[in-house]
Amino acid sequence: MMSSRLVGTALCRQLSHVPVPQYLPALRPTADTASSLLHGCSAAAPAQRAGLWPPSWFSPPRHASTLSAPAQDGGKEKAAGTAGKVPPGEDGGAEKEAVVSYWAVPPSKVSKEDGSEWRWTCFRPWETYQADLSIDLHKHHVPTTILDKLALRTVKALRWPTDIFFQRRYACRAMMLETVAAVPGMVGGVLLHLKSLRRFEHSGGWIRALLEEAENERMHLMTFMEVAQPRWYERALVLAVQGVFFNAYFLGYLLSPKFAHRVVGYLEEEAIHSYTEFLKDIDSGAIQDCPAPAIALDYWRLPQGSTLRDVVTVVRADEAHHRDVNHFASDVHYQDLELKTTPAPLGYH
């Protein structure tokens, strides 16, 4: 302890005899320098040119915006994150730079085959298709096992309150149906995705197939939203039903994927029946056959002049495809196989 004190005392004595550099007095704050520091005046400019104030080790790096750079450089540089020009607005304003993003990622411009602008951002032209109307609408999987019978009775039990609530308001009924039908594909796709990551294995294309099914059902909902505007209590019902059904199906898929897919297969059979009744009411005049929404014309590549009846027809064909896919997936599990061993029907809406 004493030796440390002696060494410290000797070091202090040596430092006390070190001559002070001549430029240090220039660092003492005066009235002028204090004023320049407080008000941003140019009084410190001579000291800066002389290299005396501030020293390089004291001055922090400058983190200023680059937006003012064009004014200083005569407008030679453009601000980062801008691309393209915006045409003058309706108020006669001048052209403005279109701010894309901080990362300067420009949005892609998509056009139709005829060169007109593509109006939708929720889907692209290469995601559109023509529905296969030749599919058999009368297929029915006859339940043979206890799980099959339980799945069928579960779907029948879900249909009973729907019939009471909506009766023959099939536009609103279809809207409610699609909010439920879009859940299983997403749940199954997510669980298979996590399984693929967890086991370091491929899925056989089933992740994409189920997510495509969920997206297709969501597009059904977006279409019928243009036809039937839901009331506030119907929106509240959607929240309740979706919250319960999502968690129930999630748990059911974890416990038994073959049961979960069988439930969806029977649910799609009921959807086919509902859309068939929808078409009967359109043909009888009970429901007005209004023009098809624009989103339906582009998504299903329907010809101009198509009506609501054409939309319901292609949606019913989609449901028939979903019926076949889910019954097929359930059959794969019943044979004690995994979905990854059987190629998925990609693009099979």
Curated annotation (Swiss-Prot):
<feature type="binding site">
    <location>
        <position position="217"/>
    </location>
    <ligand>
        <name>Fe cation 1</name>
    </ligand>
</feature>
<keyword id="KW-0472">Membrane</keyword>
<feature type="binding site">
    <location>
        <position position="268"/>
    </location>
    <ligand>
        <name>Fe cation 2</name>
    </ligand>
</feature>
<feature type="transit peptide" description="Mitochondrion">
    <location>
        <begin position="1"/>
        <end position="63"/>
    </location>
</feature>
<feature type="binding site">
    <location>
        <position position="319"/>
    </location>
    <ligand>
        <name>Fe cation 1</name>
    </ligand>
</feature>
<keyword id="KW-0813">Transport</keyword>
<keyword id="KW-0999">Mitochondrion inner membrane</keyword>
<dbReference type="Pfam" id="PF01786">
    <property type="entry name" value="AOX"/>
</dbReference>
<keyword id="KW-1133">Transmembrane helix</keyword>
<feature type="transmembrane region" description="Helical">
    <location>
        <begin position="174"/>
        <end position="194"/>
    </location>
</feature>
<dbReference type="InterPro" id="IPR038659">
    <property type="entry name" value="AOX_sf"/>
</dbReference>
<dbReference type="InterPro" id="IPR002680">
    <property type="entry name" value="AOX"/>
</dbReference>
<feature type="region of interest" description="Disordered">
    <location>
        <begin position="63"/>
        <end position="93"/>
    </location>
</feature>
<comment type="function">
    <text>Catalyzes the cyanide-resistant oxidation of ubiquinol and the reduction of molecular oxygen to water, but does not translocate protons and consequently is not linked to oxidative phosphorylation. May increase respiration when the cytochrome respiratory pathway is restricted, or in response to low temperatures. In S.guttatum the alternative respiratory pathway is thermogenic.</text>
</comment>
<feature type="binding site">
    <location>
        <position position="178"/>
    </location>
    <ligand>
        <name>Fe cation 1</name>
    </ligand>
</feature>
<feature type="binding site">
    <location>
        <position position="322"/>
    </location>
    <ligand>
        <name>Fe cation 2</name>
    </ligand>
</feature>
<dbReference type="GO" id="GO:0106292">
    <property type="term" value="F:superoxide-generating NADPH oxidase activity"/>
</dbReference>
<keyword id="KW-0496">Mitochondrion</keyword>
<feature type="transmembrane region" description="Helical">
    <location>
        <begin position="236"/>
        <end position="256"/>
    </location>
</feature>
<keyword id="KW-0560">Oxidoreductase</keyword>
<protein>
    <recommendedName>
        <fullName>Ubiquinol oxidase 1, mitochondrial</fullName>
        <ecNumber>1.10.3.11</ecNumber>
    </recommendedName>
</protein>
<dbReference type="GO" id="GO:0005743">
    <property type="term" value="C:mitochondrial inner membrane"/>
</dbReference>
<keyword id="KW-0812">Transmembrane</keyword>
<feature type="binding site">
    <location>
        <position position="220"/>
    </location>
    <ligand>
        <name>Fe cation 1</name>
    </ligand>
</feature>
<dbReference type="GO" id="GO:0009916">
    <property type="term" value="F:alternative oxidase activity"/>
</dbReference>
<comment type="subunit">
    <text>Homodimer; disulfide-linked.</text>
</comment>
<keyword id="KW-1015">Disulfide bond</keyword>
<dbReference type="GO" id="GO:0010230">
    <property type="term" value="P:alternative respiration"/>
</dbReference>
<keyword id="KW-0249">Electron transport</keyword>
<keyword id="KW-0809">Transit peptide</keyword>
<keyword id="KW-0679">Respiratory chain</keyword>
<keyword id="KW-0479">Metal-binding</keyword>
<feature type="binding site">
    <location>
        <position position="319"/>
    </location>
    <ligand>
        <name>Fe cation 2</name>
    </ligand>
</feature>
<dbReference type="GO" id="GO:0046872">
    <property type="term" value="F:metal ion binding"/>
</dbReference>
<keyword id="KW-0408">Iron</keyword>
<dbReference type="GO" id="GO:0102721">
    <property type="term" value="F:ubiquinol:oxygen oxidoreductase activity"/>
</dbReference>
<feature type="binding site">
    <location>
        <position position="217"/>
    </location>
    <ligand>
        <name>Fe cation 2</name>
    </ligand>
</feature>
<comment type="similarity">
    <text>Belongs to the alternative oxidase family.</text>
</comment>
